[in-house]
Amino acid sequence: GLYHQKYDYPPETILSHTFWEERPEEFYRFYRDKLIVKGAKPNAAHLRLAKLEREGRLKAVITQNIDGLHQAAGSKTVYELHGSTLRNYCVKCGAFYDVDFIANSTGVPRCPGCGGIIKPDVVLYEEGLDEQVLSGAVSAIRRADTLIIGGTSLVVYPAAGLIRYFRGDHLVVINMQPTNADAEADLCIAKPIGQVLSEDVVVEE
C-alpha cells in the first residue's frame, strides 16, 4: 500500500527499536513523514473528556495515541501507554526537545549540547511500556466504577489486557467494529467515539 510506495519496509519494521538503532536515517524520515501530525487540534471527543474531568465526573484518560491532543484539550490525568511525539530526549545527556525540533531537523536529529541522538518518547516495537504509566493506568481502572472503552478494537497488547483489572459496575464500549469486550459490556455503541461524545449524553450519577 501507501507505505511500500515510498519506503522499502513495512511500518512495523521501521518503527522498531532495532531499525531505529541500525537505520536511523530511514527511521527519522518515516517518523517525520508519518508520525508527526502538524496542526492537529483536539476534536469534540477530546474536549468532552476534558470537560467531564473538570466537572469531577471523569478521573483519568488512558490512551494509545501519541499526539498529545488530550492534554491540548485540557485533560490533566492522562496515561499515554505508547508515549508522545511531543516529548523527545537526548539518549546521551537526557536533554528535552519538543516536537518542532524533530520536525524541523534533517537526517538524524542530534543534541546541540552533546551530539547525542535525540529519541522520541514513543514506545517502539521491541520496547516495553513505561512501568509508571502502566501502573497508573491499572490503578485508575481498578478504582473506576465506570469504564468507557472508545475507539479501539482491543487487539494491541498489553493495552488490551488492562480491561481485566476493572472491577466496577458499568462497562461501556464505543467502537465502530466489534471488540473482545463486547460480551462483558453493559452497553455497546457502534458509532465513532467522536460522534458519541460530542452529543449531549446525560449521565446519571
Stretches found by the model and what they are:
Residues 1-205:
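Conserved catalytic core of sirtuin-type NAD+-dependent deacylases
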